[in-house]
Amino acid sequence: MSERKKPFLVFGLPRSRTAWLSNFLALRPGAVGHDTAIDCKSIEEFIGQFYGLDRLSGTCETGAMIAWRVLKHKMPEAKMVVIQRPTTDVAFSLGRVGLFPGLLELEQRKACLEAISRLEGTKTFSFQQLERKDVCEYLFEFCNGEAAPKGHWEHFADFNIQVDMQKRMAKLKANAEAIAKLKASVMREVAMISAGEQCLRLN
């Protein structure tokens, strides 16, 4: 598979410019998803978004990092990116819009991000680095397999693209049952992958 056709997965905590990146990294409007996992009923549905005629080029996710082992197993060709931001900064930013997540959950997601960062080929950037043109243009080329169009950075640099967190929380509540089932299926698949890896080590 050519570099241009390989899907990319960008992972970061909430309030880490993932919504902005889903617009900046898109070769055409709508080509890159944002938190698409919350609309998927299965891991297969999530993965299926990146293959076929109307495929997404990639997605920027704030929760799907918990499935990193399954995604790496089933999408070994996918390019992975991690955006790191301190959990205390994330919690403060969320608090400014009236949301107060548990730090334990944020730390668990951060641990997943750190595991993804250790994978060979993963590109990791800090939240602050996304203010730099050279970093964002490098990230664009890594994800898309081609350089950003002239003036692309300048067009998006001053855009403050953020998720309406109140609407997002309402959506999460409405999809809570499906999301719980998706998480459970991910955990089962992780257990199967771990068991398979253990068998290989024993042999």
Where in this protein do the model-derived segments appear?
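A periodicity- and composition-biased signal for non-globular, repetitive helical segments
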Residues: 21, 91, 173-174
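PAPS-dependent sulfotransferase catalytic core
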Residues: 1-57, 151-162, 166
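PAPS-dependent sulfotransferase catalytic domain
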Residues: 31, 58, 62-147
